[in-house]
Regions:
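Ubiquitin system architectures
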Residues: 2-83
């Protein structure tokens, strides 16, 4: 399985994480996994009411939830925001 290392910012809890993402998973599934992981890492402090979106930090553009990581511009070192 191919993976990329990204830097994830979560502004609501003012935290950042370095996370490996599998390139064959859809962005929608990645968001679900990231939400669960951040919730656990923040000891339950991060609990979004609705499904968050994933954005590219540099371009501020949201990612299409229907494509895979491989089909997006997410590469090693990409900085993402989970809002």
């Amino acid at each position: 399985m191919s993976r990329v290392l990204v830097k994830l910012y979560v502004p609501i809890i003012e935290e950042k994480y370095y996370i490996w993402l599998p390139t064959n998973k859809k962005i929608y599934n990645i968001i679900i996994s990231l939400t669960k992981a951040v919730n656990e890492l923040s000891m339950g402090y991060y609990t979004p009411i609705k499904s968050p979106m994933l954005y590219n930090k540099l371009s501020s553009t949201p990612y299409d939830v229907n494509i895979t990581v491989k089909e997006s511009d997410i590469r090693n070192g990409t900085e993402l925001i989970l809002i």
